[in-house]
């Protein structure tokens, strides 16, 4: 989705650490500079991120304080017909040459406050509520409920994950984490639903060996969509 900043935010958080320090990440999702939405460059966790200040990076700064954020100010130095990505590329080239952020922008104290979907925990720690923030090409549905939230709230007690009319009372360690025997082999479990915390530490609802175009997926078979609610009780 070219304008889904929440989905992009999850993908960035999940992917950036697979790149070496000092990598420059150009983010072209909903990148137009309009109104109070500035173009920004941010140094965070020794990586550089260039994008519009539209909420995409707000999840990152909740986890760690940025090293520096600047509002990009080089637009009047470029040709009048340049697009947003041309600006981002010019900034990236400057950084790649060892240039300082203050040369291409004015330092700002923080990102623009933007309302984003966040998971929540009830005061009595009886329930976690979250939403689907990403659906991958296999139709697996990733939520914004983290494993840390789960561990801190559930604390080893019995639980029930509820999403639409489907309930889970067990977490799988991997996609193939099913009990097998001489009677029931792993191949016989293809199409079974499962819930697990993915490699990025977020709760995911999936189907073993799903295929949205043939046998179906968690998204298609359960009718799940972006922003749908999931709860753990």
What are these language model-derived features?
Residues 28-31, 45, 52-54, 72-75, ...:
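Fold-independent oxyanion-binding glycine-rich loops
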Residues 78-155:
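Anionic-ligand-binding alpha/beta catalytic cores of soluble enzymes and soluble regulatory domains
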Residues 144-224:
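A conserved acidic, glycine/proline-rich C-terminal tail/linker
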């Amino acid at each position: 989705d070219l304008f889904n900043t929440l989905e992009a935010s999850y993908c960035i958080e999940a992917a950036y650490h697979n790149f070496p320090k000092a990598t420059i990440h150009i983010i072209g999702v909903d990148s137009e500079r309009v109104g109070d939405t500035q173009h920004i460059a941010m140094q965070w966790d020794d990586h550089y991120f260039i994008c519009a200040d539209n909420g995409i990076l707000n999840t990152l700064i909740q986890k760690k304080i940025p090293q520096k954020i600047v509002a990009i100010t080089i637009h009047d130095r470029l040709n009048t017909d340049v697009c947003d990505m041309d600006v981002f590329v010019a900034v990236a080239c400057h950084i790649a040459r060892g240039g300082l952020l203050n040369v291409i922008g004015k330092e700002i104290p923080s990102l623009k406050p933007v309302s984003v979907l966040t998971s929540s925990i009830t005061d009595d720690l009886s329930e976690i509520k979250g939403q689907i923030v990403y659906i991958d090409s296999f139709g697996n549905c990733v939520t914004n409920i983290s494993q840390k939230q789960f561990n801190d709230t559930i604390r080893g007690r019995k639980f029930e994950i509820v999403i639409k009319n489907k309930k889970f009372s067990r977490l799988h360690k991997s996609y193939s984490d099913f009990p097998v025997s001489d009677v029931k082999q792993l191949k016989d479990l293809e199409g079974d639903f499962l819930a697990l915390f993915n490699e990025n530490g977020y709760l995911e609802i999936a189907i073993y060996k799903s295929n949205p175009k043939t046998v179906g997926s968690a998204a298609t078979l359960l009718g799940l969509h972006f922003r749908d609610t999931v709860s753990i009780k």
